[in-house]
Amino acid sequence: MSLNMFWFLPTHGDGHYLGTEEGSRPIDHGYLQQIAQAADRLGYTGVLIPTGRSCEDAWLVAASMIPVTQRLKFLVALRPSVTSPTVAARQAATLDRLSNGRALFNLVTGSDPQELAGDGVFLDHSERYEASAEFTQVWRRLLLGETVDFNGKHIHVRGAKLLFPPIQQPYPPLYFGGSSDVAQELAAEQVDLYLTWGEPPELVKEKIEHVRAKAAAHGRKIRFGVRLHVIVRETNDEAWQAAERLISRLDDETIAKAQAAFARTDSVGQQRMAALHNGKRDNLEISPNLWAGVGLVRGGAGTALVGDGPTVAARINEYAALGIDSFVLSGYPHLEEAYRVGELLFPHLDVAIPEIPQPQPLNPQGEAVANDFIPRNVAQS
């Protein structure tokens, strides 16, 4: 099975060390463009662009990278409760059209009550997933070309429609990750690819089996992906030294503050990440070559595969054997590590190299009539 390898655009900061300003670098458009172009040249399928108040806006960043890349896809966040599904569908179709079919979407419900309140969202965990399920139904139906009437608990639309369809049919793929039962049910019923953070393979296997069974109950099959950091070097010793160096400027106070911030979230996945290290520096290798040091201060994905190219490839293939076909990777700093992964890891894997999309046929289009419909030729009698 060929593997889809993604990279990451660090719109919330980058550098040589975690938890410190030392060794950091400016995150401007030029730097992000360098990373995107490196990923494009090296054969990554796409890049994940993060979302939230600590990041630059993912949609604007993605749009700005379209003209400077050729085949790279952009995995950007859909935010139920923050954005209406009709507006999100228009945005999704436009990004897909402008990128010539290079848009992918990641459903993000949110987990930090403080950040959600700042965005005007006061729903609890269960309510957010209810709203996300309704959002996704409307969003998908619009992209399928339907005129939508929907009267749900959280979302109400009447006569909603999309005048400009996406390039990808029936619609651009929808990714999603969540560890709670309600999240897995949403994934099973509505998404195309279920993402998990990089837990030990036996825990990932349990997740996949649960989601696969839930999807089968809905008569569906879905794909699977994993989100991991990577520290790959020419030798295993060099890789582990690089891992230790990454947290060498990290003090206990910063770790404690980070763990306190994570504790206030209602994310089951974040709780599972924190339980892998319990905020302690010792015993960070939680599974062969799987290191939890990143999660001491980084929210979300907090584990890294560490080793030389063949060793890391063997661990990736262990995940692939569970049914995972997509790997969303990152490393610090992201420009240099994109090359290291491409040069030291990719030769040991069956990597699916994306093709450059062909131009779409030019279809003449008149101005929308009364902001309501696109004029079509009428057959002459």
UniProtKB/Swiss-Prot annotation:
Gene Ontology MF terms: alkanesulfonate monooxygenase activity
Reaction equations catalysed: an alkanesulfonate + FMNH2 + O2 = an aldehyde + FMN + sulfite + H2O + 2 H(+)
Keyword S-adenosyl-L-methionine attributed: no
GO terms for biological process, alphabetical: alkanesulfonate catabolic process
UniProt keyword annotations, A-Z: Flavoprotein, FMN, Monooxygenase, Oxidoreductase
Gene3D superfamilies in the record: Luciferase-like domain (3.20.20.30)
Pfam families the UniProt entry points to: Bac_luciferase
CDD domains: Alkanesulfonate_monoxygenase
Family assignment from sequence similarity: Belongs to the SsuD family.
Note: FMNH(2) which is absolutely required for this enzymatic reaction, is provided by SsuE.
Self-association and partners: Homotetramer.
Protein name (database record): Alkanesulfonate monooxygenase
